[in-house]
Amino acid sequence: MRIAYLTGEYPRATDTFIQREVAGLRKLGVDVFTFSVRRPGEEQLVGEEQKAEATNTFYILPPNPMRMLGSHLSLLLRSPKRYLRSLKLAWSTRQPGLKGLAYQLFYFLEAGILAKQIQQQQIQHLHNHLATSSGTVAMLAAELGDFTFSFTLHGPYIFFEPYRWRLDEKIGRSRFVCCISHYCRSQGMVFAASEHWKRMHIIHCGIDPELFTPVSHQGKGHRLLFVGRLAAVKGLPILLESLAKLTPQYPDLELTVVGDGPDRAALEQQTADLGLTDRVKYVGYQSQTEVRQHLQQTDVFVMASFAEGVPVVLMEAMAAGVPVVATPIAGVSELVEHEVNGFLVPAGDAVSLSDRIGELIDDASLRSRFGTAGRAKVTQEFNIHHETARLHQLISRSLEGKENPVRPELNPSLEPAELLR
């Protein structure tokens, strides 16, 4: 089986779950060709894994004018009717105004380059992650090139503007849709015609638990960790407020912030205004190995998000046996069970957040209990080997025209060792 993977920017430091999924499918014998609309910046290539993937990925932008012209001319001559249908689809799914029309023209031109590459490499199917602009390119490329496509629906951003990104049309035209949680699937169902609900399936993002060594918890804790993009949806100002409330009682408390993003300067200023400069370290993007090292030196992982999918970094913390405090946003509660493997606090509530952090700092046995339960949850339900095997089964059966359950089953022909390798 030969399939293509498309994202807007690949590989990125924040999208390691896509790299794991690609690697898992390759281990199962699938020929996966990676495509990306844009080339990531050097700051995203933080590990050898990202650098290797970047070397083997086809980048649509910046376009070679002759390649773009040749691709579209070839597609037009091969099937004028299909080319015109694709133009009509691009027109009907454009965003409002002249700006929307201009962007749709760019997407159509990019789609032609992608479609021709997929045809030349005799690829059977195209799968897209993060179905906003790159999802539009995937949908148009599939129409231009006469092949099937699917996508993974994550959220939260596409649910802010579902009609702008024509989520309804993408679901309706896809062979299948992978939803990262039941919550995510329910939101897709809001915008999809009911006859298309059966093509929406649950495939979790996942991690390899064996890469994480469980942390040993003893005595009082004092080390907090956040990993993620420094953007408004992550609620970091609330985390900083909570830290300021806790410092009088816990004078040795410290927070490490791994990641970068548009809000970094504002967050650093807030840190200074709250008198926390000596307690908060901003270390930027880190490799997967470095993130695992940070987890080994952490007592509590905190994520105060306002909007989410199901954060992979929460899975990583739980796999390392680190107790988590998070908000019950979107699919988070399908991973974090309140008072079983972590604490869930209301979004935007700095007081509740600081109270729960304090409980975990004070109680090593509670940290240990949550850590053990968290690792078990991830191992059982968010194991990348199992999720990739489910995806492999979903792709195979869908391309054969067979129906699939909402939660695809593991292929019974695979030996346990193949699922866990």
Whereabouts are the PLM-identified features?
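A conserved mid-protein helix/loop that constitutes part of the nucleotide-sugar donor-binding site
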Residues: 16, 222, 226-250, 262-268, ...
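Carbohydrate-associated surface elements
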Residues: 183, 206
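A short, well-ordered alpha-helix in the C-terminal region of glycosyltransferases
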Residues: 252, 279, 352, 359, ...
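Nucleotide-activated donor-binding/catalytic signature segment of Leloir-type glycosyltransferases, i.e.
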Residues: 268-286
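Aromatic "clamp/platform" in nucleotide-sugar-dependent glycosyltransferases that forms part
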Residues: 306
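Short hydrophobic beta-strand element within catalytic cores of glycosyltransferases
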Residues: 323-326, 336
